[in-house]
């Protein structure tokens, strides 16, 4: 049973909350009024480790969170992470230039209404050397514009080099029982070696590991849903992966909890902070109460067998997006 984890000098409740789906990627574009109930439920439950980004909207996601925090006067109760590194208001390309970082933090602060606790570079730009981007990010910390800095979806080599230039506090990357690539590419091991916190996004497999999976065919996704472009969700891969998810579902039934709860409890058992997203208050409660699930050593071993044997089919991003991860 894991109820909190260390983040630098803090103890943060886990799991946290990923706000991306409120306004980006999953076919959703919620108004403030539509998003408020799930944010309020998170606050009421004590789920206070929140994640957003400039590109989720663009700008809209940060603004919704900022408006909510002002309305409920709850800044002191929340840990807020955001991200730059994508030219969201321009052409959408990946950029890590010092000027971009310097400019985007100001917009983040304006939309949130305060300085974020943690500021990431969202994707790594191969055209900007770390010797330019990391000092620029570090300067935000030195100026008090963020307390912690991090990288997202970088390689183990990049994380190590960046940390040699300036202290990196966190790395965010995809991790779930459905996606364990960072166990084998060295990223998790490198983060642990360097004492860098690993934040797991997509801990429910971007929808595979939910209780009432509503999609029966790849054509069932909304037109704007990014999963229409992801090989893992298309063609025969869809049906193969759906069968794998059913294997995890059987384990959850034996545990007498929901599939998301056992999936999140398993991520926590790996010592990683997860940030599952949802737009529904009841799902928020379901996710957060995964902290009450205690997996036995035998159950962890059983799930590990499923994870290691039932490998999902297809890439986790489309060809274009794959070029900007693991760099």
Curated annotation (Swiss-Prot):
Signal peptide boundaries: none
Binding-site list for substrate: 122
EC main group: oxidoreductase
A GO molecular-function annotation: aldo-keto reductase (NADPH) activity
InterPro entries in UniProt: Aldo-Keto_reductase, NADP_OxRdtase_dom, NADP_OxRdtase_dom_sf
Gene3D superfamilies from the UniProt entry: NADP-dependent oxidoreductase domain (3.20.20.100)
Keyword NADP among UniProt keywords: yes
Role noted for this protein: Aldo-keto reductase; part of the Fusarium detoxification of benzoxazolinone cluster 2 (FDB2) involved in the degradation of benzoxazolinones produced by the host plant. Maize, wheat, and rye produce the 2 benzoxazinone phytoanticipins 2,4-dihy-droxy-7-methoxy-1,4-benzoxazin-3-one (DIMBOA) and 2,4-dihydroxy-1,4-benzoxazin-3-one (DIBOA) that, due to their inherent instability once released, spontaneously degrade to the more stable corresponding benzoxazolinones, 6-methoxy-2-benzoxazolinone (MBOA) and 2-benzoxazolinone (BOA), respectively.
Protein name according to UniProt: Aldo-keto reductase FVEG_12638
Record lineage: Eukaryota, Fungi, Dikarya, Ascomycota, Pezizomycotina
């Amino acid at each position: 049973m894991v109820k909190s984890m260390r983040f630098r000098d803090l103890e943060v409740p886990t799991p946290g909350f990923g706000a991306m789906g409120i306004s980006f990627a999953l076919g959703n574009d919620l108004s403030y009024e539509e998003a408020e109930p799930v944010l309020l439920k998170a606050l009421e439950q004590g789920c206070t480790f929140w994640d957003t980004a400039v590109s989720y909207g663009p700008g809209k996601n940060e603004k919704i969170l900022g408006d909510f925090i002002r309305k409920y006067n709850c800044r002191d109760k929340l840990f807020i992470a955001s991200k730059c590194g994508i030219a969201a208001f321009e052409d959408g390309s990946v950029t890590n230039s010092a000027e971009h970082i310097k400019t985007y933090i100001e917009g983040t602060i304006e939309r949130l209404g305060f300085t974020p606790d943690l500021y990431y570079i969202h994707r790594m730009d191969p055209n900007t050397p770390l010797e330019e981007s990391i000092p620029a990010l570090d300067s935000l910390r030195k100026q008090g514009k963020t307390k912690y800095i991090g990288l997202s979806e970088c390689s183990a080599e990049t994380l190590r080099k960046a940390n040699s230039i300036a202290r990196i506090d966190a790395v965010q990357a995809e991790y779930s029982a459905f996606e364990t690539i960072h166990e084998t590419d060295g990223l998790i091991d490198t983060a642990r070696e360097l004492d860098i916190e690993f934040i797991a996004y997509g801990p429910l497999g971007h929808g595979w590991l939910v209780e009432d999976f509503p999609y029966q065919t790849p054509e069932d996704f909304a037109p704007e849903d990014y999963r229409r472009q992801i090989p893992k969700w298309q063609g025969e891969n869809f049906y193969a992966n759906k069968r794998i998810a059913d294997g995890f579902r059987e384990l959850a039934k034996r545990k007498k909890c929901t599939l998301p709860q056992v999936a999140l409890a398993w991520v926590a058992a790996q010592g990683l902070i997860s940030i599952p997203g949802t737009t529904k208050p009841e799902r928020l409660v379901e996710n957060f109460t995964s902290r009450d699930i205690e997996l036995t050593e035998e159950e962890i071993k059983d799930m590990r067998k499923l994870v290691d044997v039932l490998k999902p089919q297809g890439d986790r991003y489309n060809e274009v997006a794959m070029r900007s991860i693991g760099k």
